[in-house]
Amino acid sequence: MELSVLGQNNGGQHSAGGCSSSSCGSTHDQLSHLPENIRAKVQNHPCYSEEAHHYFARMHVAVAPACNIQCHYCNRKYDCANESRPGVVSEVLTPEQAVKKVKAVAAAIPQMSVLGIAGPGDPLANPKRTLDTFRMLSEQAPDMKLCVSTNGLALPECVEELAKHNIDHVTITINCVDPEIGAKIYPDLLEQQAHPRRQGRKILIEQQQKGLEMLVARGILVKVNSVMIPGVNDEHLKEVSKIVKAKGAFLHNVMPLIAEPEHGTFYGVMGQRSPEPEELQDLQDACAGDMNMMRHCRQCRADAVGMLGEDRGDEFTLDKIESMEIDYEAAMVKRAAIHAAIKEELDEKAAKKERLAGLSVASVQNGTSGRYRPVLMAVATSGGGLINQHFGHATEFLVYEASPSGVRFIGHRRVDQYCVGNDTCGEKESALAGSIRALKGCEAVLCSKIGFEPWSDLETAGIQPNGEHAMEPIEEAVMAVYREMIESGRLENDGALLQAKA
């Protein structure tokens, strides 16, 4: 790597906003190790806490159409309703329209906790529109968490203004710390056209690192997003993870490249492949030794509304919100009560989880650590951290790994909905086949209900359906199924068996 300065860690000094050890985490039990002020920032942010995303909603407002970089994986669209990816919106809003929309959504979806600006261009390439929106929201919706996502090119010049408007979560997309690798990702840096291209990419990297340091110094939590591009930066992202951790980033989100040809991106048109789920997990696991990882990202649209994994944007188009009467003072009272109830539920769940964790893991280990191999299981859930969705109604499955050490969240797999009504349920063979392909590597799928045909096809594919744990907490259900697998003798490691026989 040429820019050795990027690897410096300021003597190992981090502000309270940074994650300086691998014990920093995004799941509920890991949050308990954080300082109280940091935990308060994270516990109801669905992007910064894996636990929170089961309970809290978010929305993005599309006030930033322009961008200062052209990335090979991006093709912005401003009037698109049928694609689910970053850089895509149905309508671009003025700051005033955005504020009204936020208040309308917050009143209708009281569990919404976060408002973000993430495009469809770069928010900081549209500083007036972005900062005007934040200024009005901090005045008119003071109970809302505010966050912004940026490529970082204009970040250092905006840090003071962001801090002034109470933005305490910032995401920076950092795909490399080496200009040679950047040359394969960024063909043009539009604000740096006076510079040679290689010099422009070097400036981008320097600006990203400088902005990260400035944010951390001000106690602003930073999440780093990185797009995993096989054959381009996949191995290099391990170095990126080490560097951003050393500089105090709180969370690293390694996302898979989206490269469908119909999206019109350079990579999509040129046939650059996306990573397989197993490749993504391997890279995330490799980075996890140096950095706390986000694994529940849905790569949302720039106008997403609702819980992660759902989009209710059609309910809040400009023509619909124009006629809405919004009493935001009353909405804040209702929102505060609902948020308090969710926090109480999460606290009770965390206490119960702590009591049960030692027992459940001990009952699996029982002095046989290493004897039983880990297992991937898919889960159908509609939220609340429960097994509460019919297999045929799922548009995604959450994937968990169970092992003698416990249960950990791995990621999610998107699928086409198999069952869309009584007349078509069971007739969508292609959707079922796609679901089975998406669940490759999983040995069980937990759901509230499942029909005979998908049950049979899943078993044939070596995936065991399980509907016995409906409405149970996900991690408890996954561990229960894992114990059942152990008791059936399915999970003995070959090496452990040979050693036992010897």
Swiss-Prot record:
Domain of life the protein comes from: Bacteria
Enzyme Commission no: 4.-.-.-
Residues annotated to bind [4Fe-4S] cluster 1: C67, C71, C74
Pathways per UniProt: Cofactor biosynthesis; Fe-Mo cofactor biosynthesis
Swiss-Prot/TrEMBL keywords: 4Fe-4S, Iron, Iron-sulfur, Lyase, Metal-binding, Nitrogen fixation, S-adenosyl-L-methionine
Cofactor comment: Binds 3 [4Fe-4S] clusters per monomer. One cluster is coordinated with 3 cysteines and an exchangeable S-adenosyl-L-methionine. The two others probably act as substrate.
One GO biological process term: molybdopterin cofactor biosynthetic process
Cofactors: [4Fe-4S] cluster
EC supergroup of this enzyme: lyase
CDD domains for the chain: NifB, Radical_SAM
Bias (Low complexity) ranges: 11-21
Region (Disordered): 1-21
Alphabetized Gene3D superfamilies for the sequence: Aldolase class I, Dinitrogenase iron-molybdenum cofactor biosynthesis domain
PROSITE patterns documented for this protein: MOAA_NIFB_PQQE (PS01305), RADICAL_SAM (PS51918)
Listed GO MF terms: 4 iron, 4 sulfur cluster binding; lyase activity; metal ion binding
The keyword Lyase is assigned to this record: yes
SUPFAM superfamilies according to UniProt: Nitrogenase accessory factor-like, Radical SAM enzymes
Keyword Iron: yes
Pfam families: Nitro_FeMo-Co, Radical_SAM
Residues holding S-adenosyl-L-methionine: Y73, G121, T173
Binding site for [4Fe-4S] cluster 2: C297, C300
Physiological role: Involved in the biosynthesis of the iron-molybdenum cofactor (FeMo-co or M-cluster) found in the dinitrogenase enzyme of the nitrogenase complex in nitrogen-fixing microorganisms. NifB catalyzes the crucial step of radical SAM-dependent carbide insertion that occurs concomitant with the insertion of a 9th sulfur and the rearrangement/coupling of two [4Fe-4S] clusters into a [8Fe-9S-C] cluster, the precursor to the M-cluster.
Assigned protein family: Belongs to the radical SAM superfamily. NifB family.
PANTHER family (UniProt xref): FEMO COFACTOR BIOSYNTHESIS PROTEIN NIFB, FEMO COFACTOR BIOSYNTHESIS PROTEIN NIFB-RELATED
Name of protein: FeMo cofactor biosynthesis protein NifB
Species of origin: Azotobacter vinelandii
